[in-house]
Design a protein with these regions (language model features):
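An N-terminal boundary/leader segment
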Residues: 1-55, 291-292
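Short, well-ordered beta-strand elements within core beta-sheets of diverse protein domains
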Residues: 13-19, 98-102, 213-220, 342-347
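Acyltransferase
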Residues: 24-29, 58, 249, 253, ...
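Acidic/His- and Gly-rich active-site-bordering loop/insert found
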Residues: 53-55, 63-140
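Immediate post-signal peptide segment of exported/extracytoplasmic ligand-binding proteins
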Residues: 60-77, 224, 254-264
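Short helix-loop capping/hinge segments that flank enzyme active sites or metal/cofactor-binding pockets
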Residues: 74-93, 257-266, 315-369
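Short glycine/serine-rich loop segments
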Residues: 104-236
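A short helix-breaking turn/cap at a secondary-structure junction
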Residues: 192-280, 284-285, 328, 361
Length: 375
């Protein structure tokens, strides 16, 4: 029976590389073949990096055969979002207003970290223009579709990564998230993602969304996201917010028993309307945690809907994209993005600073709240 890699995890692939039952060349070739077959159905990729991926896979195979992998992701096919600089590959931000010929001569920190760990970039994934919304379509690449039902969206803004993860077109996928752009696609495509705490993962160039924007992993399993995050969460001198983090060992398996753990649970944060089927699934997860011995306290965190504060910061960030565009270029933008960017021009400095203060106060409130709980 022929080997199939449509559900293979990065964790299992690395184990098979080590034991010699799988070669990076075989895995990368299979991945590229399936991208060629499946991408026309979902439009998850902005570009394919086939020639370089095959060359790097051959080099990785030789290292594994010699028993000397270059890093914790050696030979693993990965994708990078179109908002993230990737040396040698176009970064167009989903926009016809960006340069068609680069130059793309430098890696963003996470692109460099992944490559230094041995990961092989097989392509870049789609985003709405400048990552502005929770569905994925843009004037440059068109509509990205959900693999579960191509009449539906995979969400956004990391919709290409979500669709690629669902189809395992690459085993690890990079996303970014300011207002749900990892969390929404993962929920729409049945995949797993993390918006890490700001300051764990370096980001450069700086996002127009300032500290709202975080970079993180999107995968098919929690363990693969932990593996990817352990590589992404390394310092880089270009991001002064990231010093030398000494975070948790994300790869250590959780304890078999949660006896003694205190877990805070809010079904709706005190203000959100939750779909009944989703609420039921979450209740099942809570029951499972209780069965493992945890004490679950049902409590709302004690803050009101922060949407107004978020929108002030979001609109002000969006308007920065207009500063370098002439009238003709602005006319070519996604009309929805142009609308919120122009609304951002009406945000006063006082309103912006007030929103920053409100966010800081909420951060402090939640930090104190979490001090009382393990989870």
């Amino acid at each position: 029976m022929a080997d199939t890699f449509e559900t293979l995890t990065a964790t299992d692939a690395l184990a098979r590389f080590s034991e010699g039952s799988l070669s990076p060349e075989t895995l990368v070739e299979d991945c590229l073949t399936r991208i060629e077959r499946d991408n026309p159905k979902v439009n998850a990729f902005t570009c394919i990096n086939g020639e370089e991926a095959r060359r790097l896979a051959a080099e990785s195979a030789r290292r594994w055969q010699a028993g000397s992998p270059c890093g914790p992701l050696d030979g693993i096919p990965v994708t990078i979002k179109d908002l993230t600089l990737t040396k040698g590959l176009p970064t167009r931000l989903g926009s016809t207003t960006t340069a068609t010929d680069g130059p793309w001569e430098v890696d963003a920190p996470i692109s460099r970290h992944l490559r230094n760990a041995g990961a092989i970039v097989v392509g870049k994934t789609t985003s709405p223009e400048f990552g502005w919304k929770g569905v994925t379509d843009n004037p440059l690449h068109g509509i990205t579709r959900n693999p579960w039902n191509t009449e539906l969206t995979p969400g956004g803004s990391s919709g290409g990564a979500g669709a690629a993860a669902a189809l395992n077109l690459g085993l690890l996928h990079q996303g970014s998230d300011a207002g749900g752009s990892i969390r929404i696609p993962c929920s729409f495509t049945g995949t797993f993602g993390i918006k890490p705490t700001f300051g764990w993962v370096p980001q450069w160039p700086a996002s127009t969304m300032s500290t709202l924007s975080h970079l993180g992993p999107m995968t098919r399993t929690a363990r693969d996201s932990a593996l990817m995050l352990s590589v992404m969460a390394q310092p880089d001198a270009r991001d002064g917010y990231v010093g030398n983090p000494t975070g948790p060992d994300w790869l250590t398996p959780p304890p078999a028993s949660l006896s003694g753990w205190r877990i805070a649970f809010s079904a709706n944060l005190g203000y959100v309307e939750v779909a009944p089927d989703i609420a039921q699934r979450v209740e099942e997860a809570i029951a499972y945690l209780e069965a493992l011995g945890a004490t679950v306290e049902r409590i709302d965190p004690g803050f009101s809907d922060p949407l107004k504060t978020f929108n002030t910061l979001w609109f002000a960030g969006a308007t920065q994209a207009l500063e370098k565009l002439n009238e003709q270029q602005q006319a070519a933008l996604d009309p929805g993005f142009l609308e919120i960017a122009r609304r951002g021009q009406d945000v006063s400095l006082s309103a912006y600073l007030a929103a920053r203060r409100e966010r800081s106060e909420l951060t402090a409130h939640m930090a104190a709240f979490h001090e009382r709980y393990d989870l």
